[in-house]
Amino acid sequence: MAQFYPGSTKIAENRRKFMNPDAELEKLREISDEDVVRILGHRAPGEEYPSVHPPLEELDEPEDPIKDIVEPTEGAKAGDRVRYVQFTDSVYFAPAQPYIRSRAYLWRYRGADAGTLSGRQIIEARERDVEKIAKELIETEFFDPARTGIRGKSVHGHSLRLDENGMMFDMLRRQVYDEETGRVKMVKNQIGDEFDEPIDLGEPLDEETLKEKTTIYRIDNIPYREDKDLLEIVQRIHQLRSEAGFSPE
C-alpha cells in the first residue's frame, strides 16, 4: 500500500484521504456541467471544444509502443487545447491547501499538471478533462464556498482576516454571501467576468465541521507539534538531507 502521508492526527488522516485515489470524496453540493463551464470562463456553454490538433485516431504517427500502454484522456483523444482551474484556500481551516492539492492532484488525475504557490494552486489539463476535474473539486469536500476561492487572477486573500460572514477576502468579489438565504453565490467567473445569472454554491460549512475536515495544522485546532509520528519523519528527512549535503565521511 502506498505511504501517502505520515502522522497519526486527524489532519494527517484528512491529508491521506485527499491523496489516496481509492478514497471516495464526500459530495457536498451539486453543480451543473453548464455552470462549471461558466465558472471556468474558457468557452461559452454549448460551444464546441476548440482543438490544437486533429483527434488522435486521425493522426498518422510513427509506431510507438508507449501509445499502446498508456490510454490517452478524453481531452487528448479529441485534440483539446490545454486550460486550467485555480483555487485559493484560506488559512482559516479551508478543507484543502496548496501543497496537499498538488500531491492529491498528481495521485488522482491523469494528464494533468499542477503548480503550487503560497496561497493558490493551479491545475492544467486538456479542456474537457479540466472541466471534469473542476466539477469534482467544487462539488466535494475539497471545496467550501466561504473558505475556498475559484480565482484565475487577483488571487490574494488566503491569509487575510475573514469578514463578518466568515468569507475569505476577494478583491474581485467573485463569491458573495447572501444574508437572506445563508448561501454563497458566485457572481463572476474565475477571472472576474460578471455572470448574467449567479451560480448557487450552497451553504458554507460551520466552523466545527471545517476544523474536522481541514488539512491545515493550526495552534487553535491541532498543532503540528502534537503529531509525533509526523515530526519524527520530517526530522529524519531533514537530518539525512543536511548530512548528505555536507558529505560527511
Curated annotation (Swiss-Prot):
UniProt superkingdom: Archaea
Main EC class the enzyme belongs to: transferase
GO annotation, cellular component aspect: cytoplasm
Gene Ontology annotations of biological process type: methanogenesis
Cofactor names: coenzyme F430
Keywords: Cytoplasm, Methanogenesis, Transferase
Region feature Disordered, mapped onto this chain: 43-62
Coiled coil: none
Disulfide bridges in this chain: none
Sequence positions that bind coenzyme M: 120
SUPFAM superfamilies: Methyl-coenzyme M reductase subunits
InterPro entries: Me_CoM_Rdtase_Fd-like_fold, Me_CoM_Rdtase_gsu, Me_CoM_Rdtase_gsu_sf
Cellular localisation: Cytoplasm
Catalysed conversion reaction: coenzyme B + methyl-coenzyme M = methane + coenzyme M-coenzyme B heterodisulfide
Subunit comment: MCR is a hexamer of two alpha, two beta, and two gamma chains, forming a dimer of heterotrimers.
Role, per record: Component of the methyl-coenzyme M reductase (MCR) I that catalyzes the reductive cleavage of methyl-coenzyme M (CoM-S-CH3 or 2-(methylthio)ethanesulfonate) using coenzyme B (CoB or 7-mercaptoheptanoylthreonine phosphate) as reductant which results in the production of methane and the mixed heterodisulfide of CoB and CoM (CoM-S-S-CoB). This is the final step in methanogenesis.
Similarity field: Belongs to the methyl-coenzyme M reductase gamma subunit family.
Name this polypeptide is given: Methyl-coenzyme M reductase subunit gamma
Annotated source species: Methanothermus fervidus
